[in-house]
Amino acid sequence: MYRNVCVIAALFCIAAAATAETYIQQDSIARNKQDYAYLVAYTEANYAAFPAIMQAGYGAPYQAMKDSFGAKIGRGEWGIKQAACEYVYWFNAHFDAHFYVDEYLFWQVYKRRDTPDYKHLMNYAPQAVSQRVNRKTWLLRVPSCAGQNPTNEWVAQAVETFLQSGCKHLIIDLRGNSGGSDMIWIPLLPLLIDHQANMPETYWFRNTYANRYSPAMQDWLLAQIANNEDPAPMFLQVGAEDDEEDEAIPAHDARIHISFIIDRKTASSAETILRVARNYTDRDRYTIYGKENSAGAAETGNLFPFHLPNSRIQVFYPTTVSSVFLRDGQQNGAAGIAPDVRIELPYPDTLTDNVDSWVLYIAKRPASPNHLKEGAQQSGQK
């Protein structure tokens, strides 16, 4: 009898444990579904580029993607971390690299699909550099736009030193620069502006309660939208459109040729200076060099974070979007800015505070209109 009771008790414990495990699993799925629903709803309501993407005709594939991922969560095939990464990467890969999940899985698995792991290809730790390369060429390496390494003051002094050097070829190295603030480029603007904008544009803030009252709201942005009374439009203009025909072109030396070096980590504010050149600089005065395109985070900005309620996964999304994005949907926006000349050399062994092999290669090339034709041919061969 005692043995039977023990056996029954043991079986009861096993059954209870199995039942508890089932309940935990079901509870986990329920929480994952809640988090996924929150991610979807928050994105649709607040992500600045979302309306443009839908208006560009991507509603059907988006709905199919959203439903498919939700079903996989419901069946227990995916956890919330994978689902969140898959959902956000759909936008990140096709439209806008500014939308991302702040998780190791996102950066080391999903972004590896389109971004080389440079630290495994070379000694990759770009540092600020301002120095002469040869008699005619100056190198300005700017690894960040965050205003710390380098500072805005350092960049201003570097530009002044270059202008005093007599060099007529400026290499602006943007490899590894994932952005920060556009303010860092102000000292360089007079060197780049040859004419009025080829394509006037402005930025628009997606005017939602969550965006307006986010703790991440910056004072300068709040000042531009604060005077709009509720109910306000879905989008509020941030700054004036850059098509002022009476705005004077700054005096500068038009003999200076500017070469940019980019990689797939060149993003956001680092892409801004490339867009300035493409919009304002005479075409024979600049060249973009690289092996890969830039990151594709050029036409949105002002990132805010939010957390999924159960898992606390953090997602960053842009609250402003360019009028260029709104005009055409930019279905290839995440492809980034393509180099004019794709560098066929191997990656350098070291990219730190040195003059690397790519810089030496560019310094020896003639800065003439012929580089554009040659660059187009090289790009087409890739």
Give each language-model segment a name.
Residues 234-258, 266, 335-345:
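A cross-taxonomic marker for long C-terminal extensions/tails that follow the last structured domain
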Residues 16-19, 241-246, 378:
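Intrinsic low-complexity, intrinsically disordered segments enriched in polar/basic residues
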Residues 160, 246-249, 275-278:
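Mature extracellular/periplasmic domains of secretome proteins
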Residues 2-15:
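Sec-dependent N-terminal signal peptides
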Residues 322-348:
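A recognition module on extended beta-rich or small alphabeta surfaces enriched in W/G with H and D/E
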Residues 215-245:
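Aspartyl protease catalytic domain
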Residues 20-227, 254-260, 272, 284-287, ...:
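Flexible, low-complexity junctional segments that flank or bridge functional domains
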